[in-house]
Amino acid sequence: MSRPITIVTGQWGDIPLEKLAPMMSGFGYDGLELGGGHFDITRGAKDRKYCDRIRALLDKHHLKVWAISGHVVGQQVCDPNDSRSDAFAPPELAGKPQEKRVWAVATMKDAARAARNLGVEIVTGFVGSSIWHLLYSWPPVPEQTIEEGFQYFARMWNPIFDVFDECGVKFALEVHPTEIAFDAITTKRAMEAVGNRKAFGINFDPSHLVWQMLDPAQFIREFPDRIYHVHLKDVAVRLTGRNSILGSHLPFGAAERAWDFRSPGHGDVDFEEIIRALNHIHYQGPLSVEWEDSGMEREFGAKEAIEFVRKLNFSPSSIAFDENF
């Protein structure tokens, strides 16, 4: 089992793909998870020649692509769409929540078409949530209100998943706070809300689970047939008795934050247990480094990360160790 090691390009959006591809190839990555400004979803849905040019550029540098990212677009499908998401939509839609939503739905349908044209079977991303702000049950939140949130997710996303089915592409939700699914319980409920359809699965990222005090390896084993894609990102939890796990309204990188993302191997994620769990479910897709660390130089981190992941990327045993005495 030789899983490819890729890197998410969204955090490198300031570097053109023509420069980023040879850089990441030089670091030793096998491919790119295209996001940010490195792949135009709408253009890719309509222009096969554009997709061919992207492929040719990657081929030139011995890179492949197994997934494209639709995170910032997908978020706007179910999000309240306040001013925070204005930067993620066309400028003329700023301050127009419903118009952003309509655009996001159309663009996520295009994401499936663009993936097909690029020869990719997975779109990773977010779905948003109309009920995330109701996480803390005060004032009291009726169960019916929560159920309506899951049904709203189903109404908004089932037509999108219909297009994914038509294109032979799957959507992998990054289970994450601010999404309809942020732990195992809400993931199961979200899947049930859309009829457990195969178009909807998981982009597994342990960093978002660990700071919520979840067990990432257990999560993998609970959804063995729905782990469609994997992000490798670390997180460090540093509760001091003064700060809250909720973040204290402090930005990433602030010294007093209770938790922060780290380059793989520099936080609290038990990556060996994750690899063992992935081996257990026979996952053979990419291990995609999503590099985020406010305390480390970016290129140093990306180079170190692939070496760390390469050492972890072991196959399961093909024999029982106690059969050969």
Give the location of each predicted region.
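Boundary/entry segment of secreted carbohydrate-active catalytic domains
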Residues: 1-15
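Short, well-ordered coil/turn segments that N-cap beta-strands
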Residues: 1-5, 28-30, 59-66, 118-122, ...
